[in-house]
């Protein structure tokens, strides 16, 4: 009987020991992921207090700019170049207000959140090849998908990132490439999707054939 009792105690001990090891392993894994998240946050903090359109509007003149064609590459680049100084001032203001340190990833996210949250989506009656000047979009506060894409691309370029436009049937959005971040891969900026986070793209758009236009 004593031998059987000792064996039962041994089995219970082994079960408790295995359970303790399992709990310790789960705890260690959880702590590891928490430490990784904390490290990433310290490396690339999230934007806070992204300014409103009303605040940014104080930096703009009242006069609206002329629209231009979106399918003439030289004209798109020229318009962005001509508005660079104004756009750079606005981009720097948004970046400085939103990020406590000069982190390019945080600043890029702040610019995306500003356009996504502050610019209202106003669809065209038909998808055509005319775009509003990015300064006009900031002044009116409304834009279709093409206009939002050009504005975002201009803002991202103003802080030193690469940017390009992506066209799919009936829609357009922007992409950004940030130096020394994720292998400088192209990240999606879909500002018309109010639920999309930085880099995300709705599935119905992700599967479509795309034409890319770096600016």
Label each residue range with its predicted role.
Residues 2-215:
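A structural boundary/capping signal
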């Amino acid at each position: 009987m004593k031998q059987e009792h000792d064996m039962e105690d041994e089995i219970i001990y082994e079960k408790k020991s295995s359970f303790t090891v399992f709990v310790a392993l789960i705890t260690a894994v959880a702590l590891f992921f928490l430490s990784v998240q904390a490290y990433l946050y310290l490396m690339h903090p999230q934007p806070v207090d992204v300014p409103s359109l009303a605040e940014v509007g104080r930096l703009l003149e009242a006069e609206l700019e002329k629209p231009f064609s979106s399918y003439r590459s030289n004209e798109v680049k020229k318009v962005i170049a001509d508005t660079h100084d104004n756009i750079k001032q606005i981009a720097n203001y948004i970046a400085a207000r939103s990020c406590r340190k000069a982190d390019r990833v945080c600043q890029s996210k702040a610019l995306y959140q500003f356009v996504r949250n502050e610019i209202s989506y106003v669809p065209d009656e038909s998808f055509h090849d005319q775009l509003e000047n990015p300064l006009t979009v900031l002044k009116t506060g409304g834009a279709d998908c093409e206009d939002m894409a050009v504005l975002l691309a201009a803002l991202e370029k103003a802080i030193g990132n690469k940017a390009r436009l992506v066209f799919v049937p009936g829609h357009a959005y922007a992409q950004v490439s940030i130096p020394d971040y994720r292998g400088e891969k192209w990240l999606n900026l879909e500002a018309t999707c109010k639920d999309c986070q930085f880099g995300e793209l709705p599935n119905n758009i992700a599967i479509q054939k795309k034409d890319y236009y770096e600016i």
